[in-house]
Amino acid sequence: MAKKITGYIKLQVPAGKANPAPPIGPALGQHGVNIMEFCKAFNAKTQADEGTITPVVITVYADRSFTFVTKTPPASVLIKKALGIESGSSVPNKNKVGKLTKAQVQEIASKKMPDLNAASLEAAMKTIEGTARSMGVEIV
């Protein structure tokens, strides 16, 4: 018989840097999950992407056990990484902070594809382009 699910926890944690401090500790603590066990498992699974913000969905069961699924980093993080910038523009329609080529957009879209609600790579590329435009990045 399947285990009874008592809750889901969604967090964005830097890859390889999970620790019991807030926000992870309190979120897991209120569900009775072993915090150190999660931190060790998460850090082991994400050590290749060290430092990149990684969304994670933790499923907590009635017996206080858990499973977790890591997602791909947010599109904005991937765009900033591709351009080597700290943050997007505060006035995106006036100040442009960089230029993204179609090839870079395609690479980011193919990386994000499993987590995007897009039927094709072209649709995923349009989603990424929209995110880039809202950050003040020009598509060339």
From Swiss-Prot:
SMART domains: RL11 (SM00649)
Keyword terms, alphabetized: Methylation, Ribonucleoprotein, Ribosomal protein, RNA-binding, rRNA-binding
Single annotated GO MF: large ribosomal subunit rRNA binding
Biological processes, Gene Ontology terms: translation
UniProt PTM comment: One or more lysine residues are methylated.
Any Pfam family the entry gives: Ribosomal_L11
GO cellular component terms listed in the entry, alphabetical order: cytosolic large ribosomal subunit
Top-level taxon in the UniProt lineage: Bacteria
Complex and partners: Part of the ribosomal stalk of the 50S ribosomal subunit. Interacts with L10 and the large rRNA to form the base of the stalk. L10 forms an elongated spine to which L12 dimers bind in a sequential fashion forming a multimeric L10(L12)X complex.
Family label: Belongs to the universal ribosomal protein uL11 family.
Function according to Swiss-Prot or TrEMBL: Forms part of the ribosomal stalk which helps the ribosome interact with GTP-bound translation factors.
Entry protein name: Large ribosomal subunit protein uL11
